[in-house]
């Protein structure tokens, strides 16, 4: 049992989650939340307060999950909570992929640079289309990493879930993410050929 706990603490998954949760907590501690557009404010209002799940922007399934959870967590805005947690999951996925490919030290530096550039905006200015783009990118990157390493285990399915949730938040970014996935996949196949 002790070995399993030590192995879990040394794993790339724990590394990715721990570093991104710490960064998320620091940013949340020093900033205040705001909506980047009025659309997300109204989506949040309709879904979490009025429980109106039919929306042109947000998928019905995601709106139903968010609104139903709002009945349980009365003191939190679940729309904002989901945006923050999904952003943290996406940043953690990108960190995991880089730790898997380049090692923990390079992944740590990359994660710091990535979070300095993007996480402040994701955690303080809530916008569902930004979160969707981040989720789709991270999800496709996780899936590509799993396909490349021929490991169709938990990271692959987490990548698929991130793509699904990213599509739920903003469907129009799915094809942009898919184009990047295809470009990464072709580039990776070419790089493998010359190894």
Map each language-model feature to its residues.
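Short hydrophobic/aromatic helix or loop-helix immediately within or flanking a transmembrane segment
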Residues: 53-77, 81, 85
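Start-transfer (signal-anchor) and selected internal transmembrane alpha helices
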Residues: 1-24
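Extracytoplasmic catalytic/substrate-binding loops of multi-pass membrane glycan-assembly enzymes
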Residues: 26-45, 53-66
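Aromatic- and kink-enriched transmembrane "portal" helix at the membrane-lumen/periplasm boundary
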Residues: 111-138, 142, 168
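Transmembrane-helix motifs of polytopic, lipid-linked glycan transferases
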Residues: 84-104, 142
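Membrane-interface alpha helices of multi-pass inner-membrane proteins
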Residues: 154-176, 181-182
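Perimembrane helix-loop-helix junctions
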Residues: 176-195
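Membrane-interface transmembrane helices that cradle and orient dolichyl/undecaprenyl
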Residues: 139-156, 190-193
